[in-house]
A protein has these predicted regions:
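Helix-loop boundary and gating motifs at the non-cytosolic
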Residues: 1-52
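Structural signature of the two symmetry-related core transmembrane helices
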Residues: 71-86
Length: 194
């Protein structure tokens, strides 16, 4: 396997899960300090799976037919990073938990499709997936772990900075995605409903 492609895909996986790990585990530590109840925090975690159910119907249908995967990945992460910045700004500005959770929902609508997309990008650019994919994918797990360590080391596990870290990393991954190997759409033609 080409060393440059391996490095690109490994970095993509690392950043993909760093974005998520930067806020997902420690969010209640901060949200509780700005007035979120246990129910509000429950909704913070419920909106992600709801987004995961909804987003493939739109992003998947369009991405698989009309756009290169790396371009969709870039757009999703850039938009998701901006939405996470907005959510953090709403937290800082004292917005209601419901409106903050709605903004997190919007950011997750852009994030969840990229989980499958990152695997697609990796699989389509690896000659021997059985041999090479595990060593690339494990960098995602390492990215998640390093995000947690970074929050602890920086003292951010109870601060709004975790959301800013996720936002900045998402935007960086969006920009980095533009350098990933070209991965054209797998299908062509009109989008149909059935």
């Amino acid at each position: 396997m080409n060393a440059k492609v391996r490095l690109q895909l490994s970095a993509m996986m690392f950043l993909q899960f760093f974005v998520w790990g930067a806020w997902y585990v420690t969010a209640p530590n901060y949200l509780g300090t700005i007035g979120f109840t246990a129910g509000d925090i429950g909704w913070t975690y419920a909106v992600g799976p709801i987004a995961a159910i909804i987003s493939p119907f739109f992003v998947g249908m369009i991405a698989d037919r009309f756009f290169a995967a790396q371009h969709v990945m870039a757009a999703m992460h850039l938009l998701g990073g901006v939405l996470m910045f907005v959510a953090a700004g709403m937290m800082k500005g004292g917005s209601s938990p419901g409106s903050i959770n709605f903004m997190i929902f919007l950011s997750q609508l852009t994030y969840y499709p990229t989980l499958a997309m990152s695997n697609t990008l990796a699989m389509k650019n690896i000659a021997d997936t059985e041999r090479d994919f595990p060593s690339i994918r494990v960098l995602g797990t390492i990215g998640w772990i390093i995000a947690g360590f970074a929050l602890s080391w920086l003292g951010w596990s109870t601060q709004i900075n975790m959301f800013y870290l996720a936002a900045v990393t998402g935007i960086l991954l969006g920009l980095f995605s533009l350098s990933l190997p070209h991965t054209p759409p797998t299908q062509t033609g009109k989008v149909t409903a059935g």
